[in-house]
Amino acid sequence: FGSLLGICLVTQIITGLLLATHYTADTNLAFASVAHTCRNVQFGWLIRNLHANGASFFFICIYLHIGRGIYYGSYLNKETWNTGVILLLTLMATAFVGYVLPWGQMSFWGATVITNLFSAIPYIGQTLVEWAWGGFSVDNPTLTRFFALHFLLPFVIAGITLVHLTFLHETGSNNPLGIPSDCDKIPFHPYYSMKDILGFALLFIALVAMALFSPNLLGDPENFTPANPLSTPPHIKPEWYFLFAYAILRSIPNKLGGVLALAASVLVLFLIPLLHTSKQRSMTFRPLSQILFWTLVANLLVLTWVGS
């Protein structure tokens, strides 16, 4: 899945760059500029659909990648693992600021709700939120800085990815048995390159099918309405890939407690290498750990379902 994530990143940067050429980061024009891209730009609708659904595929790939890393004990390559968690956090930040850009209802209210969480931080919270907003509510300054961040962060991700790969190159990759595989090494090309191309093809077919046949399947219908600060949508919720965290946030009645739980649900990945006590690296021959692992997966799926 690592190679698929690389392809996702490249695709997102290319489609994003093409979209940015037609986008206007202004509260009065943002929604109209996206509509203009879809209607009047050659293949603008396709580029937008690929970009929007590409984000979903990016998250599908990264969650599978992390799940596999946990299952096979890959987190024992501590530097690789920690840079990977930082990559996940950066990706989540990028997806969040990107979701705000079309300036639909859910964009606006999602931005309002999530940035407002920073006000739960004691003492500096309120100042921090107003500083992030550039005013006393989510408005034009917020949109322009979010566009700047959304343009910048993917290149930051690309940079950290190189660090991630460098650390991986130090140790070599892991395998399902969790034992050294020096004696089984084979040339990257043509073997691994062909294996990766199969993955690319499957990912690409799935993405194109999604973008062409049901591009709005994962989107929120509220986002077809331009942002209106005076009318709150009946249910504010993020895109599906944040629902597990959002469900955790909303299940805790205390604001600060919810924010801490939300942060912990992702940051717990940093602790995993410290919690490994088994003499075996991978879960291949550890039924109890397997049960716990699949319970965790089921838990995430249930949280995602409940969050919506």
Swiss-Prot record:
InterPro entries cross-referenced by the UniProt entry: Cyt_b/b6_C, Cyt_b/b6_C_sf, Cyt_b/b6_N, Cytb/b6-like_sf, Cytochrome_b_C_euk/bac, Cytochrome_b_N_euk/bac, Di-haem_cyt_TM
Q: How does the cofactor attach, per the note?
A: Binds 2 heme b groups non-covalently.
Q: Name one process (GO BP) from the record.
A: mitochondrial electron transport, ubiquinol to cytochrome c
Q: Which cofactor does it need?
A: heme b
- Residues that bind heme b b562: 51, 150
* GO molecular function per UniProt: metal ion binding; ubiquinol-cytochrome-c reductase activity
Location relative to the cell? Mitochondrion inner membrane
User: Where do the TM regions start and end?
Assistant: 1-21, 45-66, 81-101, 146-166, 194-214, 256-276, 288-308
Keyword terms: Electron transport, Heme, Iron, Membrane, Metal-binding, Mitochondrion, Mitochondrion inner membrane, Respiratory chain, Transmembrane, Transmembrane helix, Transport, Ubiquinone
Instruction: Mention any one GO cellular component term assigned to this protein in its UniProt record.
Output: mitochondrial inner membrane
Its placement in the membrane is given as: Multi-pass membrane protein
Show the Pfam families listed in the entry: Cytochrom_B_C (PF00032), Cytochrome_B (PF00033)
- Where a ubiquinone binds, per the record, is at 169
Q: Which residues bind heme b b566?
A: 65, 164
Give the protein's biological function: Component of the ubiquinol-cytochrome c reductase complex (complex III or cytochrome b-c1 complex) that is part of the mitochondrial respiratory chain. The b-c1 complex mediates electron transfer from ubiquinol to cytochrome c. Contributes to the generation of a proton gradient across the mitochondrial membrane that is then used for ATP synthesis.
Homology family: Belongs to the cytochrome b family.
**Subunit relationships:** The cytochrome bc1 complex contains 11 subunits: 3 respiratory subunits (MT-CYB, CYC1 and UQCRFS1), 2 core proteins (UQCRC1 and UQCRC2) and 6 low-molecular weight proteins (UQCRH/QCR6, UQCRB/QCR7, UQCRQ/QCR8, UQCR10/QCR9, UQCR11/QCR10 and a cleavage product of UQCRFS1). This cytochrome bc1 complex then forms a dimer.
The further comment given in this record reads:
Heme 1 (or BL or b562) is low-potential and absorbs at about 562 nm, and heme 2 (or BH or b566) is high-potential and absorbs at about 566 nm.
Q: What is this protein called?
A: Cytochrome b
Q: Which organism is it from?
A: Amblyornis macgregoriae (Macgregor's bowerbird)
